[in-house]
């Protein structure tokens, strides 16, 4: 019995499913999850000492690599002064100022402790600001596990949303309209049906929870125009893409300006941090300035602020964003070339420091429907064969992969050598 297996069996006695977030259980790919003992740079080490090149990066935050000395020093030195105060600190001002300088659409920002808190709070703020109830989201996009966002499309061209999880009341879901990502007509239809009732539209600028689906040309700009036309707040959820697709986020990469932005992952440098921010006129409606309530015991935690400040300060150094994108492209194009060499039907999408792989006969994958038509069984075989060779990919065919600045040319070459063997087995 492996150490991971014994730990997993033990965990299931006291932790639901043996994990504290569902995707970690390997249900999407089968088998036993690997239990991690430590990480350094681009590598994970499991409880038996096996090394893996890591393309998950704690699901996105570890953009500098694991255990980066600058972040580690900031965390240790800050912790020596106290772990939490429940009072304002200079660090939270410094991080807020840095975020606003990097993301031009953000005039003011509120720190929270998770991406879910960020999206939940931004939507509440939009509803309070507009005095409307309905929201628009997109099928296949994930914005955390708040009740109003755990909603899927019903039957028909446009319906009121249906809960995607037990425990979400239908009365909550009915205020959420679910449209089709990369399909502006579906959004136009929603606004035409409820022209004076939609408080906001929230979108992942690159859909990273149906693997990696970039926006088609003009899609985000079309959403901006529709929100302007109907008086809805335009929210871009950059929890995954923020500082990763580009230093100013996907919004600067694609040239679109939201009213509100949600952040997470990279902004915490590996610590639990989220944030939402945007136009001053909207942000002034949040308490204590305005009537829309939002609070958090650990919001602005000094250790988390120090980690985020260290991470973003390092990331913004000249050449880092370009190198991250170059390494991602090198891996993505290398994988595609090897799949073609072995005649394995395969599509790879990539932008900035994130990528997605799809086993499919389709020429492109740019929609939720296209993702659902891909061969998940072949992905599962690829995942386990790569894992056996020391390459750790996301354990789900529907999750994006992440590059870090710690990944060397040698790491990518080793990954491609492993993929060459695995593609030959799949051919």
Curated annotation (Swiss-Prot):
PANTHER family: GLUTAMATE-1-SEMIALDEHYDE 2,1-AMINOMUTASE, GLUTAMATE-1-SEMIALDEHYDE 2,1-AMINOMUTASE 1, CHLOROPLASTIC-RELATED. Keywords: Cytoplasm, Isomerase, Porphyrin biosynthesis, Pyridoxal phosphate. The modification N6-(pyridoxal phosphate)lysine is found at residue 265. It holds the Pfam family Aminotran_3. GO terms for biological process: protoporphyrinogen IX biosynthetic process. Transmembrane segments: none annotated. Its main location: cytoplasm. This is Glutamate-1-semialdehyde 2,1-aminomutase.
């Amino acid at each position: 019995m492996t150490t991971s297996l014994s730990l997993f069996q033990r965990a299931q006695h006291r932790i639901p499913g043996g994990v504290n977030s569902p995707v970690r259980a390997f249900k999407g790919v089968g088998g036993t999850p690997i239990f991690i003992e430590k990480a350094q740079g681009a590598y994970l080490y499991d409880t038996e000492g096996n090394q893996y090149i890591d393309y998950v990066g704690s699901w996105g935050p570890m953009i500098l690599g694991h255990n980066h000395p600058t972040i580690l020093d900031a965390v240790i030195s800050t912790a020596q002064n106290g772990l939490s105060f429940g009072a304002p600190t200079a660090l939270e001002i410094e991080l807020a100022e840095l975020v606003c300088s990097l993301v031009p659409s953000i005039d003011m920002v509120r720190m929270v402790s998770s991406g879910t808190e960020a999206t939940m709070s931004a939507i509440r703020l939009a509803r309070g600001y507009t005095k409307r109830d309905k929201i628009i989201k997109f099928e296949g996009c994930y914005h955390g596990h708040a009740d109003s966002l755990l909603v899927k499309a019903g039957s028909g061209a446009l319906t009121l949303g249906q809960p995607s999880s037990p425990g979400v009341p239908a009365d909550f879901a009915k205020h959420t309209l679910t449209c089709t990502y990369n399909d502006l007509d579906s959004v136009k239809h929603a606004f035409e049906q409820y022209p004076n009732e939609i408080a906001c539209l929230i979108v992942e600028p690159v859909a990273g929870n149906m693997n990696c689906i970039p926006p088609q040309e003009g899609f985000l700009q079309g959403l901006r125009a529709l929100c302007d036309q109907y008086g809805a707040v335009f929210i871009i959820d950059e929890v995954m893409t923020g500082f990763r697709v580009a230093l100013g986020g996907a919004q600067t990469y694609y040239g679109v300006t939201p009213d509100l932005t949600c952040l997470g992952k990279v902004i915490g440098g590996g610590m639990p941090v989220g944030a939402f921010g945007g136009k001053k006129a909207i942000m002034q409606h949040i308490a204590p300035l305005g009537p829309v309530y939002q609070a958090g015991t650990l919001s602005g935690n000094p250790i988390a602020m120090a980690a985020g400040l260290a991470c973003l300060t390092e990331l913004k150094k000249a050449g880092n964003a370009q190198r991250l994108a170059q390494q991602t492209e090198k891996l993505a194009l290398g994988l595609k070339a090897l799949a073609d060499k072995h005649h394995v039907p395969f599509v790879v999408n990539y932008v900035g420091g994130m990528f997605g792989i799809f086993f499919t006969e389709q020429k492109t994958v740019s929609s939720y429907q296209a993702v659902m038509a891909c061969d998940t069984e072949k992905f599962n075989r690829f995942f386990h064969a790569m894992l056996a060779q020391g390459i750790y990919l996301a354990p789900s065919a529907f999750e994006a992969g992440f590059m870090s600045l710690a990944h060397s040319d040698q790491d990518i070459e080793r990954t491609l050598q492993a993929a060459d063997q695995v593609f030959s087995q799949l051919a």
